[in-house]
Regions:
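FAD-dinucleotide binding site
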Residues: 1-337
């Protein structure tokens, strides 16, 4: 039963042929994850992973790097990857109606002021004054939940200035790059696929950022196909524009499934979080040698400014981690007032 379910969930292709014996891929994958786990050092995976000349290395690099971390092997810390984060045993699955719909329904009775840009936070007095494009909000305390991409960009000015170490944490727990190119088909080109993950052999070797992506097919029976280029390659692809992202993703799928998928294509959509001014990246992780800044980032300032969001969460890289971290910080504030 496990083998059948496994084969339903994962597909591996070399060119246009599905591989039934995937040992070559998983050998490189298992050795890479084992090497990262074994080191327990605050170094980059590229310094420790073996089989870097193997023909499946770029695919493994894509899975463990840009797909899981939003970063290439040279840009994140093994210690951050290995840290014992509190990931729910139930797993994280796609919401068919969209996660935004879930959040909107869950908090529909919560008073929220949308489309209000914060430009400054003054914490020099006994409380805080939050400057927005719709006026100033005064409070005893506040929670900052924006991404480290926004924090490191300087869009929000803090007065007095934050400590040098706190400022540095915005840069050291840096944003990865992970973009989503989604296609909707009249019918799936892969039969019986549901919540299926597809990996393929990425041929171009000797690149610091693999030029490919992993694919999620038919999440929650939506008939969608989500291609997720990430890392520096994904960042540069986003800069090239929406058409470039669509063309690249569709051309890679055609190499696997052939030009016949064109006739079943209904819609396409591209999300480039790296170019979105509200995020300026996908999610955050520690750079090599910078794992200690995770804790620095979580610390409150003057018992008045609290920080939450996925970069501070122990359920890292997830929307539920961001939600839980915000709830936890709110509870701290309520108990302290």
């Amino acid at each position: 039963v496990y083998k059948e379910r496994y084969e339903e969930m994962y597909s591996v292709y070399s060119g246009n042929k599905r591989i039934s014996n995937e040992d070559a891929l998983w050998k490189v994958y298992d050795n890479a994850t084992a090497a990262i786990a074994k080191t327990r050092k605050d170094v980059a995976p590229i310094d420790v992973v073996p089989y870097q000349d193997d023909r499946w290395f770029n695919t493994v690099h894509t899975i463990i790097g840009p797909w899981e971390m939003g970063k290439d092997f040279s840009n994140y810390s093994c210690k951050d990857f290995n840290f014992d984060y509190e990931i729910p045993e139930s797993g994280v699955w796609h919401c068919k109606e969209g996660y935004g719909s879930l959040v909107a329904d869950m908090y529909k009775k919560t008073p929220v002021q949308l489309n209000t840009k914060v430009t400054a936070i003054d914490w020099g007095g006994s409380g805080v004054k939050v400057s927005t494009d719709k006026g100033i909000i005064s409070a005893k305390k506040c929670i900052v939940t924006v991404s480290n991409g926004v924090l490191s960009s300087g869009q929000i000015k803090f007065t007095p200035n934050l400590s040098a170490e706190k400022e540095e944490s915005f840069f050291k727990i840096s944003m990865g790059h992970y973009n989503r190119v989604t296609f909707k088909f009249k019918k799936l080109f892969k039969k019986k696929a549901k919540d299926n993950y597809l990996y393929y052999r990425i041929d171009k070797q000797n690149t610091s950022s693999p030029e490919g992506f992993c694919v999620t097919i038919n999440p929650s029976d939506t008939k969608l196909c989500m291609c997720d280029p990430g890392g520096e390659f994904g960042k540069n692809l986003a800069k090239a524009g929406i058409d470039a992202s669509l063309d690249f993703a569709l051309s890679e799928l055609k190499k696997i499934f052939g030009n016949k998928i064109n006739k079943d294509l209904k819609q396409s959509h591209v999300v480039n979080w790296s170019t979105n001014p509200l995020f300026l990246g996908a999610w955050a992780s520690a750079e090599p040698g910078a794992f200690k800044f995770r804790e620095v980032l979580r610390q409150s300032v003057g018992d008045r400014i609290y920080f939450a969001g996925e970069a501070t969460a122990k359920d890292w890289g997830t929307v539920n981690g961001a939600q839980v971290s915000g709830i936890n910080q709110a509870k701290k504030i309520v108990s302290s007032i």
